[in-house]
């Protein structure tokens, strides 16, 4: 989502309605002419908004209304003449110079331009409903109508002005959910509210390069930069005045047109309607804006302004102090002074002072323009009139002098120095003249509105601390001047008051301060006290007109004007407060003042011992109300207003608030032998007492300021005291502020949590249709409505396959289940495959099906078997990093390479005949397996490798998967590739070709692949194997764990010996080596696995142990052969055994010298060899599972009977047969003869029954059954997983669940911890462990009991269940 560019200053907006407002100054406005309206419309169309990228774009009104963020571009409206402006500077200049109704008595009408943050608030005059503009303006336009150019987007109303529309949209609070906490304005979007809040919070990132001013928006900075610009290229054709923009010039021309219309109406009124037409001469009259004198030429008007109103002329602003030349801008003036008057000293033209720079001279000239009163401006409002001295106060300014009395020395001469308009006196009881305001930091006092003053404070004095403005009437503190003005207008103004005689009553509902002894009224408390002390006080301090009988005696202190009821209390007050010793009688005489002498007003509390200094009477009054509420003051009717606001003496150089300190050296006047003190009006009879009294005054003046907190008194100035006192109230803390909502947090974690909870949106993306939703419920509804389509599936109950169409299911039943009924001779005795559970009608069909489960391609490294050669080659590349497919084929590919059947060019006709021949050969082998001819036929045919190579295979032309039967290939193509058996036409071949072509292409050989993983595996073949395994002995890296194991064997120091290093027993073969390693159980480690008894290296699996045995035995045979060739007379028998390897039958364990004497059969994917005798017993109906070993045949009482299915050993033949009938009823007798024998454990053990729960072993089945029954009685049938608290009904299911725990997050693959075979199901891995690996292969040992486990999760569950405290 792109963010809209910041609003830029635009030209003035045209006025679309007639001006119907009559202002208070007596100017009557009329409807503008059509020419003026058309001119403004053309100017509006030609106005362009310049963006940040420097490009210009014309924007019409309709486009601006349709913008999404229209609420963020405020319109500035003049409340006097109802003109709309889009630029803050244009409105300010209009109100200052051009607005004809700017002389009204409402200073709050220019509220909109007070600051960038206040332009979004409703106008005070609009909220209160008063003002000169509302008298003539009807409310119909603001309420809206129909057919107007600015329609509301929430209702059917439309408005004639954009400002009315924006004001109306604020009432739709339900449509505008985001509210500004500062000005309560509503917004439709959160980003608009956040951008607006920055105007309040002061996020000022746009700084001025000319001064230290900073702004939050770029358009405000551009407005400010115009104050530094000296160019005014746009000139007025009437008065030749220059302007910086066309909008300012246009607004100025409107003033000229209104002057003409006003003169025309005035002239027509004088003629009493005698002539209806206005002459051409009257239309050309030009009127002065200040005295209403008319002129026929513009030159005469300019000459009149320069001569009669020089203080108001624009040309009188910048005049050289050395010569009468006038300049239009400050830069030209300074350049003129540097060039022409560079050698002259900078001297003040009004006094004899000299200054080092021109800037200092101009700052000094401002001091000559200050009036005698501390109130710099003639404001009509008692609260707002003295902004500099009464309203602006910081929270810690109670101990500082008034800012208004100390002008800022850093003021630049370029700031406006326009002189004040002459204000009329108040003697006639009426108020007239222009309202002006003064700055509390500098000497500027010609601000005609609070808005202009606010802009001045925020631009020129932005580095000053934040001000708090206090109301003089109720002492309430307000943040801005605008808020103070509104507070006075609402809280202290009575609508029904008549203020014709007293102008102060126009702005306050509180009556002026009344004198208790005469009907006079005064605007402030200082004037009232001075009036009482001068007019109503006699020589003895008694107020004139009061009598002692009535008890109205009032005695006032000449020093601080405090009132007392008795003369004794007044005398005591003077002795304690104003002097250390009384030398004479106190008399209340007003001293003679010299108005021409400058003075400084200071106030101090008379009730505090160490009184702080107050710069204004307001601060002293607030201090007395807060700290001295119970002290009685002068008894008069205005006790609260007069007595509480009485000023007190100060211990600085000026004591009285209305006295002037005499600067010249003067001696006390001696009259009638008395020495009067000119500081406190005390008289002394002796000169010594008078000198002692003066000494006390000097001590008070020289006494240093003390800190009220720590009583430190070494402060030379008030600023030093204030800086020191600030330290006591200042503390620093680190807070983390949210940029969006300005909330503060003490730590980064709390802020991040707040951002995640409040300012982070979680979106939900539908991957099916790419739609985005903002809540989980929404996307659930979307999935339920759009993507939850019912679809009927057809499932085969025999093999649990699902089909989308009924025809596909029928085809599957036809090929897989039709035509295989059970034998009639043996009802219910259908042959069932022990591997997949599928049933067959005849034994031949079952045997043919069993061949599909055989895996003819075995890995010579790890013993894993595969159906197809391509799978074996992939296994060699991935697991063993062998890239030659022929090297890894241990059975069918070692001599003859790839089988002939694994080709894509297999024909169905030949495949059918080959399958029939295969069935005939298999049946003949089963019937004549015990004869010698069978063995001879095997020898004649060239061995089992040739038989394997001649077997036909049906390969998939898409993925390369090979099957022994065509039906299996068809099922594979239907299940995995969705290709039906009948699709053999050209269309299906095209579809097949498109399907075969993958989307992932190799950049090296241009081969395509279906998935990215396949391409990644193929790319590894070009780069070579990745070496991730490092040898801990030499640091060399290897691509697989197998190659690393083979490398580690080469570091063995026992390379030429085949003896055990522990018991020194010689080892002759690999089988003896493995058997002997198991005879030393103390060498086994639960963490790392086994140890080789020859080289003592630690191995982690039986596979690695086999590699060690092969390596050591090969070294032993090679060393023995070399020794025999060296001249040994007789060869050792060990060498003969090694030269002639023996092969054993899997059932009877007889040894055979030739491998061809054994018949190969695969059971569970593993190859086994059976002799001819075992095969003949299987065909004659004898149980092949009953096996008597030749070694134990001659021993009495010892038998070797094992079950071929579960490899459990039995003592008698009856026990084995009963076990098969009970536990393995579905096992085929023809396939049960293959016995599973591992090379690692050729010696049978005594205990053959083991409990899965506690791993105890038993000799007989009855013992383990009793043991399992005890488990069920004691512990129940439920078995709980301690890792996740899930319940299972058997220990085997619990073990399968623990295997899943071990491989969580591994991508759905399960790897055997012993031989590293990978499975996709946990139960398959469990079956593999039970079938291949035994008790000796377990890795993890329990530290508290002798139990061992394959997986760590088994050990953890065992520890929590059996050994938990």
From Swiss-Prot:
Q: Which GO terms describe its molecular function?
A: chromatin insulator sequence binding; zinc ion binding
ZnF locations on chain (C2H2-type)? 76-98, 150-172, 178-200, 206-228, 234-256, 286-309, 318-341, 346-368, 437-461, 469-492, 513-536, 555-578, 603-628, 675-697, 705-728, 736-759, 764-787, 794-817, 831-853, 857-880, 954-976, 1000-1022, 1029-1051, 1090-1112, 1201-1224, 1249-1271, 1279-1301, 1310-1333, 1340-1363
Listed Basic residues bias regions: 1-11
Domain of life, per UniProt, equals: Eukaryota
Q: Which GO terms describe its biological process?
A: cell differentiation; nervous system development; regulation of transcription by RNA polymerase II
Task: Spell out the Basic and acidic residues composition-biased ranges.
Answer: 37-51, 261-274
What protein name is recorded for this chain?
A: Zinc finger protein 423
The source organism is: Danio rerio (Zebrafish)
């Amino acid at each position: 989502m792109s963010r809209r560019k910041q609003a830029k200053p635009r030209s003035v907006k045209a006025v679309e309605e007639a001006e119907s407002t009559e202002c208070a100054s007596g100017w009557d406005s009329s409807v503008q002419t059509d020419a003026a309206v058309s001119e403004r419309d053309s100017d509006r169309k030609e106005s362009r908004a310049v963006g940040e990228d420097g490009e210009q774009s014309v924007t019409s009104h309709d486009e601006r209304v349709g913008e999404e963020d229209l609420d963020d571009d405020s319109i500035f409206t003049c409340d006097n003449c109802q003109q709309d402006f889009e630029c803050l500077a244009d409105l300010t200049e209009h109100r200052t110079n051009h607005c004809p109704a700017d002389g009204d008595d409402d200073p709050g009408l220019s509220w909109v331009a007070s600051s960038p943050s206040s332009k979004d608030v409703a106008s005070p005059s609009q909220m209160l409903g008063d003002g000169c503009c509302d008298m003539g303006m009807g409310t119909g336009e603001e309420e809206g109508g129909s057919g107007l150019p600015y329609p509301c987007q929430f209702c059917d109303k439309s408005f004639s002005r954009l400002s009315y529309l924006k004001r109306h949209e604020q009432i739709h609070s339900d449509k505008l959910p985001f509210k500004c906490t500062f000005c309560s304005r509503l917004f439709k979007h959160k980003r608009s509210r956040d951008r607006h809040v920055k105007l309040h919070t002061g996020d000022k990132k746009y700084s001025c390069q000319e001064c230290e001013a900073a702004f939050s928006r770029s358009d405000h900075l551009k407005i400010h930069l115009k104050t530094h610009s000296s160019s005014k290229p746009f000139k007025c054709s009437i008065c030749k005045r220059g302007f910086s923009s066309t909008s300012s010039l246009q607004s100025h021309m409107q003033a000229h047109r209104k002057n003409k219309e006003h003169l025309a109406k005035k002239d027509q009124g004088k003629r009493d309607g005698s002539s209806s037409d206005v002459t051409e001469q009257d239309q050309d009259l030009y009127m002065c804006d200040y005295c209403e004198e008319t002129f026929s030429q513009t030159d005469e008007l300019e000459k009149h302004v320069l001569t009669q109103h020089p203080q108001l002329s624009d040309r009188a602003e910048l005049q050289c102090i050395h010569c009468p030349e006038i300049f239009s801008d400050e830069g030209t003036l300074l350049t003129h002074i540097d060039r022409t008057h560079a050698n002259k000293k900078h001297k003040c033209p009004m006094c004899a002072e000299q200054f080092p720079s021109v800037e200092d001279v101009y700052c000094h000239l401002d001091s000559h323009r200050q009036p005698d009163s501390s109130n710099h401006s003639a404001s009509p409002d008692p609260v707002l009139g003295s902004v500099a001295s009464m309203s602006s106060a910081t929270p810690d300014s109670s101990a500082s002098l008034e800012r208004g009395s100390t002008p800022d020395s850093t003021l630049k001469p370029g700031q406006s120095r326009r002189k004040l308009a002459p204000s009329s006196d108040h003697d006639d009881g009426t108020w007239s003249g222009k309202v002006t305001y003064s700055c509390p930091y500098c000497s500027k006092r010609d601000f005609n509105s609070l808005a202009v003053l606010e802009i001045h404070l925020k631009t020129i004095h932005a580095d000053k601390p934040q001000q708090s403005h206090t109301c003089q009437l109720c002492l309430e503190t307000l943040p801005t001047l605008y808020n103070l003005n509104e507070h006075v207008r609402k809280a202290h103004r009575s609508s029904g008051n008549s203020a014709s005689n007293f102008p102060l009553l126009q702005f306050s509902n509180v009556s002026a301060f009344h004198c208790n002894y005469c009907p006079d009224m005064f605007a402030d408390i200082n004037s009232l006290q001075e009036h009482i002390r001068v007019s109503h006080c006699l020589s003895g301090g008694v107020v004139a007109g009061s009598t002692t009988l009535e008890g109205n005696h009032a005695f006032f202190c000449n020093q601080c004007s405090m009132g007392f009821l008795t003369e004794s209390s007044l005398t005591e007050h003077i002795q304690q407060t104003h002097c250390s010793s009384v030398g004479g009688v106190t008399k209340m005489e007003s001293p003679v003042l010299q108005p021409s002498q400058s003075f400084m007003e200071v106030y101090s509390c008379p009730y505090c011992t160490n009184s702080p200094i107050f710069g204004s009477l307001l601060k002293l009054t607030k201090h007395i109300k807060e700290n001295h509420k119970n002290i009685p003051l002068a008894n008069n009717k205005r006790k609260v207003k007069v007595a509480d606001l009485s000023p007190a003496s100060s211990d600085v150089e000026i004591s009285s608030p209305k006295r002037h300190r005499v600067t010249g050296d003067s001696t006390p006047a001696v009259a009638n032998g008395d020495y009067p003190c000119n500081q406190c009006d005390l008289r002394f009879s002796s000169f010594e007492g008078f000198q002692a009294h003066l000494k006390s005054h000097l001590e008070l003046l020289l006494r240093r300021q003390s800190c009220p907190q720590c009583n430190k008194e070494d402060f030379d100035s008030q600023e030093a005291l204030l800086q020191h006192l600030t330290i006591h109230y200042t503390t620093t803390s680190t807070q983390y502020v949210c940029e969006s909502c300005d909330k503060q947090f003490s730590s980064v974690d709390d802020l991040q949590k707040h951002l995640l909870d409040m300012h982070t949106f979680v979106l939900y993306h539908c991957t099916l249709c790419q739609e985005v939703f903002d809540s989980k419920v929404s996307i659930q509804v979307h999935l339920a409505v759009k993507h939850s389509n019912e679809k009927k599936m057809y499932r085969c109950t025999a093999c649990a396959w699902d089909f989308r169409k009924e025809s596909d299911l029928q085809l599957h039943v036809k090929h897989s289940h039709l035509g295989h009924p059970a034998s009639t001779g043996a009802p219910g005795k259908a042959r069932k495959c022990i591997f997949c559970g599928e049933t067959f009608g005849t034994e031949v069909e079952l045997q043919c099906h069993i061949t599909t489960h055989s895996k003819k391609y075995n890995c010579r490294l790890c013993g894993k078997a595969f159906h197809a050669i391509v799978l074996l080659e992939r296994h060699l590349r991935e697991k063993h990093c062998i890239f030659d497919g022929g090297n890894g084929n241990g059975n069918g590919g070692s001599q003859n390479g790839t089988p002939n059947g694994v080709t894509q060019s297999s024909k169905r006709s030949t495949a059918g005949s080959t399958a029939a021949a295969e069935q005939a050969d298999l049946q003949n082998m089963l019937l004549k397996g015990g004869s010698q001819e069978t063995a001879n036929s095997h020898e004649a045919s060239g061995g089992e490798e040739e038989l394997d190579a001649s077997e036909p295979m049906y390969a998939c032309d898409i993925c390369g998967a090979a099957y022994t039967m065509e039906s299996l290939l068809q099922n594979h193509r239907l299940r995995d590739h969705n290709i039906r058996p009948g699709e053999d036409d050209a269309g299906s071949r095209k579809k097949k070709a498109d399907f075969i072509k993958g989307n992932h292409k190799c950049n090296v050989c241009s081969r395509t692949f279906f998935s990215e993983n396949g391409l990644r595996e193929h790319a590894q073949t070009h780069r070579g194997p990745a070496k991730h395994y490092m040898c801990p002995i030499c640091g060399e890296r290897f691509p697989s764990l197998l190659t690393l194991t083979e490398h580690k064997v080469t570091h063995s120091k026992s390379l030429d010996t085949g003896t055990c290093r522990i018991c020194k027993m010689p080892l002759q073969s690999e089988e003896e080596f493995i058997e002997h390693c198991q005879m030393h159980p103390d060498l086994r480690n639960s963490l790392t696995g086994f140890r080789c008894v020859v080289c003592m290296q630690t191995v982690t699996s039986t596979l690695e142990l086999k590699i060690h045995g092969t390596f050591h035995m090969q070294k032993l045979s090679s060393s023995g052969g070399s020794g025999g060739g060296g001249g040994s007379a007789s060869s050792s028998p060990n060498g003969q055994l090694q030269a002639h390897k023996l092969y054993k039958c899997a059932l009877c364990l007889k040894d055979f010298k030739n491998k061809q004497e054994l018949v190969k059969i695969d059971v569970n994917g593993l190859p086994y060899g059976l002799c001819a005798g075992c095969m003949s017993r299987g065909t004659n109906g004898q149980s092949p599972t009953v096996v008597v070993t030749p070694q134990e045949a001659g021993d009495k009482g010892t038998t070797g009977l094992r079950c071929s299915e579960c490899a459990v050993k039995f003592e008698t033949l009856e026990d084995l047969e009963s076990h098969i009938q009970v536990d393995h009823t579905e096992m085929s007798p023809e396939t049960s003869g293959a016995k599973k024998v591992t090379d690692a454990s050729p010696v049978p053990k005594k205990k053959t029954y083991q409990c899965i729960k506690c791993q105890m072993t038993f000799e007989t089945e009855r013992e383990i059954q009793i043991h399992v029954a005890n488990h069920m009685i004691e512990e129940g049938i439920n078995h709980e997983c301690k890792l996740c608290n899930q319940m299972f009904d058997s220990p085997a299911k619990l073990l399968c669940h623990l295997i899943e725990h071990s491989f969580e997050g591994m991508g759905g693959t399960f790897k055997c911890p012993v031989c590293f075979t990978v499975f996709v199901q946990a139960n398959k891995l469990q079956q593999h462990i039970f079938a291949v690996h035994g008790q000796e292969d377990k890795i993890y040992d329990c530290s508290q009991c002798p139990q061992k486990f394959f997986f760590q999760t088994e050990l953890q569950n065992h520890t929590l269940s059996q050994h938990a405290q």
